Amino acid sequence: MGGKAKILLVNGPNLNLLGRREPGHYGHHTLDQIVKELQDESTSSGVVLEHIQSNAEHELIDAIHATEAEFIIINPAAFTHTSVALRDAILGVSIPFIEVHLSNVHAREPFRHHSYFSDKAVGVICGLGAQGYQFALQSAISRLKAKSAEH
């Protein structure tokens, strides 16, 4: 890749409670631990990883609008099932993205089965815990390298 590619990692509401909140569904890793591991991996791959977590929808939208990233990894959390505005923000910037969920949303309550993002995502990873973020990052880096090789 010529220059350092950027990936924006977006984490939605309540993910700041990882490690304490319902560990049976979400695991014992904290968000800080997950982000640190991803930053280490991205740095070793020559990619810049920017991260935002917010419980406020408008802050996530503003970060997406302002990003210069070439790829987005997003765990919209509860906004998955409710936020047309967040969906529109991602579609508005035309940046490819992967949707990640720690738990298997399809094995949970029926209201969690619908996503406003999945139909537009490059891929969806759910139910693999914190490792799902690693898979998303590896895929994003691979796609960015392939895109760079084409140019």
Curated annotation (Swiss-Prot):
Indicate the annotated site residue(s) for Transition state stabilizer: 21
> EC number(s) of the enzyme?
4.2.1.10
Question: Enzyme group, top EC level?
Answer: lyase
Cite the Pfam families for this sequence: DHquinase_II (PF01220)
Quick check: keyword Amino-acid biosynthesis in the entry? yes
GO molecular-function annotation terms? 3-dehydroquinate dehydratase activity
Active-site annotation: 26 (proton acceptor), 101 (proton donor)
Question: Quaternary form?
Answer: Homododecamer.
Q: What is this protein called?
A: 3-dehydroquinate dehydratase
Q: Origin organism of this chain?
A: Shewanella sediminis (strain HAW-EB3)
Gene name linked to the record: aroQ
